[in-house]
Amino acid sequence: MALMLDEEMDENVTTIKVIGVGGGGGNAVNRMVSDGLQGVEFIAMNTDQQALAKNHAATKVQLGSKLTKGRGAGADPEIGQRAAEESKDEIANALKGSQMVFITAGMGGGTGTGAAPVVAEVAHDLGILTVGIVTKPFSFEGKRKMGLAEQGIANLLMHVDSLIVIPNERLKMISQEKITLMNAFQAADNVLRQGVESISALINVPAFINLDFADVRSIMKDAGYAHMGVGSAKGAGKAENAAKAAISSPLLETSIAGAHGVIINITSSPDIGLEDVETAAGLITQSAHPDANIIWGTAFDENLSDEMRVTVVATGFDNKAADGLRNSLNNAAGTGASTPSAVFSSDVSGAGAAKQQPAAAANSAAKPVEEESSDNRYYDELLAILNKRK
């Protein structure tokens, strides 16, 4: 009987995979592996063979080996996109068996910007709940890189269920004191790590008031832009402080104001007072839309002592841009027409939707990529820029 129970529990465990695409996404995966994050599987995908070899992920997928010869995308999102399209079968094989995936990438470069939307498309077509968490460049990196990033985000939004965007510019807001470049990027990665860790625990760890994968899916499926925050606090006012930290992170462009779908999870010691739970949940509920679908759960952790931890996932914002992209996608599907992945324009003057250039893509398909990868030189270049400004 016990064996049957164990088998049933194994079947009910939701498989969650975290996919780092390109240099920035690969670095985020490396940090999570080093932090010992449990309950998820890690996959690294890159055009750069050397960077992939150094990655700590258990599963690795080289994108576009025929196209790039393992040299990277040369900071060209179109190359990144074509490389991922070449490797769609390998991507699908790596994703099989998962119910939920997080796709993380740095937007504005080559592989992450171009390949992440293709990876998301494959995942979504497999029926996997697909969540994107990406970063946007610093303002000093220039309009062209920002324009490519905005294009990449628009393309990604078409294929994910939920999308969380972290502007690097906001990394300067995490401390009043001088912050190192390494600490800044770690702070961005922490948003991903805490979110993945919290959602994995929500779904797979038994709790006093339990949430399951169906709850998470009901909030995050086909939701567009999303907010995911984790707050913790101790002592007097911990409920209010933890809730406020969860609903308004300085690193995100979003808050939960106007959200139509909200997941609340409160973790604390078993002796938590009802008043604290009511304070935290009430503050979050008041910040969302009056008719929001609120799903909440609570778990006990003896190790937290006086600490309360609040996790919030919010979706269903009134966003015309997101709705427009999704309507275009749905209209194409409704007419029976296939919706091609957006092709990147090499002439980007600002943010905007991706321009369709099938002819240009076809003409360049036969050309091998000779550029050395700049995805992983990105951080060296960034350090050089910062050093010049000292």
Give a label for each model feature:
Residues 1-390:
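Tubulin/FtsZ superfamily GTPase core signature
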